[in-house]
Design a protein with these regions (language model features):
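Divalent metal-dependent phosphate-bond-processing catalytic cores, especially two-metal-ion Mg2+/Mn2+ enzymes
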Residues: 2-26, 39-67, 78, 102, ...
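An amphipathic alpha-helix signature
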Residues: 24, 28-32, 55, 94-101, ...
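A generic structural signal for nonpolar/aromatic side chains embedded in well-ordered alpha-helices
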Residues: 31-34, 122, 139
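His-Asp-centered metal-binding catalytic motifs of divalent-metal-dependent phosphohydrolases/nucleases
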Residues: 68-87, 92, 96, 117-126
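Short acidic, glycine/proline-enriched loop segments that cap or flank alpha-helices
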Residues: 87, 109-110
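All-alpha amphipathic helical-bundle segments outside canonical DNA-binding/catalytic cores
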Residues: 112-116
């Protein structure tokens, strides 16, 4: 008879192999190396907060929407890595998708379809006013929610207001949180 932990591991990982179960940690280790090598400590701090904050928020939203939370966790970690690594935000979504593909291929972490899914979400995450695939929307929503939750007293960016209101409504939080418009 299986114990509770074994049952939960099978449930959480949907029967994936041990190697697949460690994909998140393998990617986290790779990203940590990039961030640790950043000379600007303030940018490094922002990188850790934002990338891992979005990653956790992606996992939460994916679980709620019955999407792959493991891939969602990975896309959150990767989505703005190019901006922090290159210290350049120009066309960061497109450059970020290219970097994500290179990293995923180098580490052999994902199938071709999974890599395409992750790269699509990264490529489209700056287009907050446009609706893309359900998985793309997880990243956009997590990005907006992390910006807000970092400090709810900060003004909400104009292009994120509608999406934030929809998220707070989806998670039945709009009556508890006031946000700066």
């Amino acid at each position: 008879m299986e114990n509770y932990i074994e049952k939960m591991q099978k449930h959480i990982h949907n029967g994936r192999s041990e190697e697949m179960e460690n994909r998140i940690e393998r990617l986290r280790k790779y990203i940590d190396e990039i961030l640790l090598n950043m000379k600007d400590t303030q940018e490094r701090r922002c990188g850790y907060i934002h990338l891992y904050g979005v990653s956790q928020t992606c996992a939460f939203i994916a679980l709620k929407r019955n999407l792959d939370f493991e891939l969602a966790t990975m896309v959150g970690m990767l989505h703005d890595l190019h901006s922090y690594k290159a210290i350049n935000t120009e066309n960061h979504a497109e450059h970020g998708a290219v970097l994500a593909r290179q990293i995923l291929d180098e580490l052999s972490l994902t199938t071709e379809n999974e890599t395409d899914l992750i790269c699509s979400a990264i490529r489209n995450h700056s287009s907050k006013a446009t609706t893309h695939s359900a998985f793309d929307e997880v990243l956009k929503d997590a990005d907006v929610l992390q910006h807000y939750l970092y400090n709810p007293l900060f003004p909400v960016m104009e292009h994120e207001k509608c999406r934030l209101q929809n998220l707070l409504t989806e998670f039945v939080l709009s009556k508890y949180y006031k946000y700066n418009m």
